[in-house]
């Protein structure tokens, strides 16, 4: 599909609830992605990451209320890197224009022929999962050779663009090195508190709405559809040394049933340093490209009464080609099949005491595909319906030391159903701001109909709702402006039976 720079590199609205340090971490992650794309000679994504970095440093971070008062070294360092980024953008601009023009010509020719460009997987041996709107699915023969595809610059967003050169020029015109302190009017426009700041009248939830977790009986029965597995896994050892039953891989791996393989092989990830002369000096990781399975989630869930719980029903997974105008184009994310069951075993003692457990998902990027390679169990405080991580800096230290991207989080609902509460949505908002591809995995072992789900905030609908919500604790949310669900099942996630990962328990 055509690349619209106004959307794939759009300005990020500042949220003063997010610490300024986290915004600089977002900038560092963008440069790390750019470093990987530079090494892989991926000019299109390299250009987009550099453009996002430029926008973040010049158009978002300076409007944070703590920008002038804190982190002076980060402020000076980011401005120095911005100069190098703009110089590289200028040098890449002609080649980027040529590649984009070529992509657009190919698409135009395809449309004239009356055919659509295929959805291309950026990993070899990928198994295409049927579109979410199809009512019935057929299971492939796992003994047949898996289809392969070569890396392509086809983007899976439903975007339209006029002149990409005009968009590029407009992006450059926005960039400036002279960051003057913003006046009060500017701050009020960019503040999540609105023009009235702290004086704004808080809107309390309606008194007749009672917010609580639903019981399992609130869910109606659903005809669960399964996932297509990528084929038998190679032999692997479990975390505790037990042998595996290969036959379980021949069952349907569904996010709506509980038949996951129980163990995983814990293997330390291999890392390499960027050998090229990179002014940003970030470390990339090399990972294998095993056969994935698209994490399609059944979408016909029985509706929960709105009086019982806030945001009870997620939206269905929307394939990229059917995405809404202005939505993000997410890069694929591979999740180890066994990581969910292993997490449940690690959380068993808390679950038996009706306490939630949470973990942080982190991993690598290779060939436009994110891979979850590390499950971090942080120090935490738990209740029956909440879980709070402690010592966030320790988590950041692990991610930085191992050069890992923050790819989301996972947590349990010991006795509740599988859904995202209002507290969960606010928690995931911080992850998705850090990286749009980040996911939230919910494990509900007592929910027989939907024991697990992989979700994220809809963008821009859900992200906007949570950004503008100033309430805390369990509360209902206003409906999004376009009427779309606040959160939805992920369409960019693949379950990978061969992906290896390690567990770091910091408790």
From Swiss-Prot:
Location relative to the cell: Membrane; Cytoplasm; Vacuole membrane; Late endosome
Entry binding sites for Zn(2+) 1: 411, 413, 424
Coiled coil residues, start to end: 73-107
Pfam families: JAB, USP8_dimer
EC number(s) reported in the record: 3.4.19.-
Region entry Disordered, spans: 133-162, 214-242
Consequence of gene disruption: Seedling growth arrest phenotype. Impaired central lytic vacuole formation, autophagosomes accumulation, and mis-sorting of vacuolar protein cargo to the intercellular space as well as disturbed endocytosis.
Cofactor note: Binds 2 Zn(2+) ions per subunit.
Domain MPN: 333-463
Cofactor: Zn(2+)
Example of a GO MF term: metal ion binding
Main location, first listed in the record: membrane
Record Gene3D superfamilies: Cytidine Deaminase, domain 2 (3.40.140.10), Phosphotransferase system, lactose/cellobiose-type IIA subunit (1.20.58.80)
Site features described as Indirect zinc-binding, chain residue numbers: 356
Sequence motif JAMM motif, residues: 411-424
GO biological process: endocytosis; intracellular transport; late endosome to vacuole transport via multivesicular body sorting pathway; positive regulation of intracellular protein transport; positive regulation of vacuole organization; protein K48-linked deubiquitination; protein K63-linked deubiquitination; protein transport
Keywords: Coiled coil, Cytoplasm, Endocytosis, Endosome, Hydrolase, Membrane, Metal-binding, Metalloprotease, Protease, Protein transport, Transport, Ubl conjugation pathway, Vacuole, Zinc
GO cellular component: cytoplasm; endosome; late endosome; vacuolar membrane
Composition bias type Polar residues, residue spans: 146-162, 214-224, 232-242
Binding site for Zn(2+) 2: 426, 469, 475, 477
Transmembrane residue ranges: none
Subunit structure: Interacts with PATL1 and PATL2. May also bind to HSC70-1, HSC70-3, VHA-A, BGLU23 and EPSIN1. Interacts with BRO1/ALIX.
Family per record: Belongs to the peptidase M67C family.
Function comment: Zinc metalloprotease that cleaves 'Lys-48'- and 'Lys-63'-linked polyubiquitin chains, but is not implicated in protein degradation by the 26S proteasome, deneddylation, or desumoylation. Required for intracellular trafficking (e.g. trafficking from the Golgi to the vacuole and the vacuolar trafficking of endocytosed cargo), endocytosis and vacuole biogenesis.
Protein name, entry field: AMSH-like ubiquitin thioesterase 3
Biological source species: Arabidopsis thaliana
Lineage, highest ranks first: Eukaryota, Viridiplantae, Streptophyta, Embryophyta, Tracheophyta
């Amino acid at each position: 599909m055509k690349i619209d720079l106004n959307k794939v590199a759009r300005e990020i609205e500042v949220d003063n609830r997010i610490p300024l340090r986290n915004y600089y971490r977002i900038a560092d992650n963008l440069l790390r992605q750019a470093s990987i794309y530079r090494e892989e000679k991926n000019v299109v994504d390299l250009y987009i990451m550099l453009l996002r970095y430029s926008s973040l440093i010049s158009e978002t971070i300076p409007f944070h209320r703590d920008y002038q008062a804190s982190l002076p070294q980060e402020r000076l360092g980011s401005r120095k890197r911005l100069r190098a980024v703009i110089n590289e953008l200028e040098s890449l601009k002609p080649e980027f224009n040529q590649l984009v023009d070529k992509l657009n010509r190919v698409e135009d020719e395809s449309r004239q022929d009356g055919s659509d460009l295929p959805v291309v997987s950026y990993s070899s041996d990928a198994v295409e999962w049927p579109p979410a709107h199809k009512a019935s699915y057929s299971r492939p023969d796992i003994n047949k050779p898996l289809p392969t595809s070569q890396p392509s610059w086809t983007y899976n967003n439903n975007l339209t663009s006029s002149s990409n050169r005009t968009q590029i020029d407009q992006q450059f015109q926005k960039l400036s090195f002279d960051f003057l302190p913003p006046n009060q009017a500017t701050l009020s426009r960019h503040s999540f508190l609105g023009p009235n700041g702290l004086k704004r009248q808080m809107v309390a939830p309606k008194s007749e709405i009672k917010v609580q977790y639903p019981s399992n009986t609130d869910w109606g029965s659903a005809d669960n559809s399964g996932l297509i597995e990528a084929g038998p896994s190679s032999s692997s050892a479990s975390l505790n040394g037990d042998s595996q039953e290969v036959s379980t891989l021949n069952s349907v791996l569904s996010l709506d049933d509980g038949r996951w393989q129980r163990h995983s092989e814990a293997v330390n990830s291999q890392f390499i340093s960027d050998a090229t002369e990179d002014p940003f000096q970030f470390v990339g990781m090399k990972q294998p490209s095993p056969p994935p399975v698209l994490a399609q989630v059944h979408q016909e869930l029985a509706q929960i009464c709105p009086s019982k719980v806030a945001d009870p029903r997620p939206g269905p997974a929307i394939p990229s080609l059917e995405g809404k105008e202005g939505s993000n184009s997410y890069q694929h994310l591979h999740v180890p099949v066994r990581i969910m069951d292993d997490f449940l075993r690690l959380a068993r003692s808390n679950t038996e005491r009706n306490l939630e457990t949470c973990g942080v998902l982190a991993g690598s990027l290779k060939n436009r595909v994110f891979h979850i390679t590390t499950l971090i169990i942080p120090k935490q405080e738990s209740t029956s319906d909440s879980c709070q991580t402690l010592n966030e800096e320790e988590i950041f230290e692990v991610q930085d030391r191992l050069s890992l991207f923050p790819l989301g989080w996972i947590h349990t609902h010991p006795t509740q159903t599988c859904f995202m509460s209002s507290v969960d949505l606010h928690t995931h908002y911080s992850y998705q701001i850090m990286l749009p591809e980040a996911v939230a995995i919910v494990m509900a072992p007592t929910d027989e109909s939907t024991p697990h789900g992989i979700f994220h905030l809809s963008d821009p609908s859900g992200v906007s709702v949570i950004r503008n919500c100033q309430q805390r604790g369990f509360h209902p949310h206003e409906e999004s402006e376009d009427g779309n669900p606040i959160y939805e099942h992920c369409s960019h996630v693949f379950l990978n039976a061969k992906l290896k990962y390690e567990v770091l328990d910091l408790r």
